[in-house]
C-alpha cells in the first residue's frame, strides 16, 4: 500500500458495505415545508426488515449506492440525502409497509417532472431486496410548484373561451379509431358537432398513419368544426392529436392547428414523455391553444396494487407539466376506477387545496396555490343510461366523452349526439331542481326520452349494457 493510499484509508473513510438504515432511516426527522414527500408501498424480500427496506428506497432514490464511496466525504450527505422518516404496516398484509420518504428540494431541477421522476421512480424499482415497490402519493411543496407553468389555461379560462357554463363539457371520440380516410373522418366530426356535442376527439393512437396523414385530418376536421359552428351558433372544437415521433414534429403540428384557428390540440403525455408534454404546454399557453391530455399507457404503470405508481401521482405530475384536460376513468364505464379513489385524484386535478383523506387514498395535504385546475375526462364504455351517475360523480367541471355511445346510435352520429346532449341537460335540470340523481337517475332519463326520439332510441339500444367487474386497485382495509 502506497503512503498516499494508506493516508486516504485512515482519514475518515472506511470502505465496505453498510446497512442502509444506519444513514437513511431517521424516525426522528421532521419533514420541512420545502421537502418533497413520498409514500411508497414497500414489499421487502423475506428476511429484510422494514426499516432496512424503507431506508434502501430512500438511499437508492437519492444519494446512496450499494457500498461506501470515498467521494461521500466531498459533499454533505445530511443536506442532500433522502430520509425514510416513518413506516406504517399495511392492514391485512403480512409483509407490506407504507414507507414515508422526505427528499430535500435541492435534489431536483426546477420545472422538470422528468428529473423528479428519474430520481424518485428510477432504478430503485428494480432493487433486488424488494419484492415489489409502488409509489402511492407525493407531496409537492409550494416552492417547487412555483417553478412550473402548469396547465396552459385552466378550467375558468376554458369556459370563457368556449362560452359554456353550468354543465359538463360534452365530447366524443371518433370511431373506428383507425382506418378511416381523412374526409370520412371529418364527416363523422361534423355530424357529431352539429348534433350538439361541444368537442370531438382523435383517438390516442391516431397520429399520422398511411390511411390518414395528420395534415389531411387537420384540414377536414377544421372544415367540419367551422361548418358545425355556423349551423349551431355554438363554439365547437376537435382535439387534434399533435403527438409525434419527435418534439420538433409535435410542435410543427401544433403550429398548423393554430394556423387553422383550431381551439384545442391533444397529446399522449405518457407515451410522448414529460419533456415533450411540458414543451407543448408552454407553446399552448403562448399561442392560446387548449391542451387535451390522453393517458395511454397509464395502466401499465398504475393498475397493479403492489408495484408501479398510482395514478394520483401521474395526475399531480400532469398538473405540473401542463394540460387542460386529462382522462381520469369513469367509475361506471368499461375502464378500471373505484369511486372513492377516482374522486380523490379528481379533486387533486381540480381543487386548490386538498387535505389528507384515508378514505380516498390521499396520503398528504396538497396545496396548489395559483396553479390552474385540470378538467377530468370521463371516457370509456359510457352511454346515456350512465349520464345521471356521471353528472352526480363528476359534477359540472368535467368532460364527458361518449365514443361508441354516440357513433353507435342506430340512427347515426348526429342523433347519437342529440341523445347525449338531451340526457345531459335533463340531468343538470333535475339536479338544479333538487332531485336525487343517484336514486332517480333512470326515471329522469325515461322522462326526457318521452320528448326526444333520439334519446328513446339510444335508451333502447343500451338498456342492458353494463360493465360490472371488481376493481383491481382498491383502498387498503381499515385497521381494527
Curated annotation (Swiss-Prot):
PROSITE patterns: RUBISCO_LARGE. Mg(2+) binds at residues 201, 203-204. Its cofactor is Mg(2+). The record marks 334 as: Transition state stabilizer. Pfam families: RuBisCO_large, RuBisCO_large_N. GO terms for molecular function: magnesium ion binding; monooxygenase activity; ribulose-bisphosphate carboxylase activity. Binds 1 Mg(2+) ion per subunit. The disulfide bond which can form in the large chain dimeric partners within the hexadecamer appears to be associated with oxidative stress and protein turnover. Residues 1-2 form a propeptide. The modification N6,N6,N6-trimethyllysine is found at residue 14. It is found in: Plastid, Chloroplast. The active site is at 175 (proton acceptor), 294 (proton acceptor). Belongs to the RuBisCO large chain family. Type I subfamily. RuBisCO catalyzes two reactions: the carboxylation of D-ribulose 1,5-bisphosphate, the primary event in carbon dioxide fixation, as well as the oxidative fragmentation of the pentose substrate in the photorespiration process. Both reactions occur simultaneously and in competition at the same active site. This is Ribulose bisphosphate carboxylase large chain.
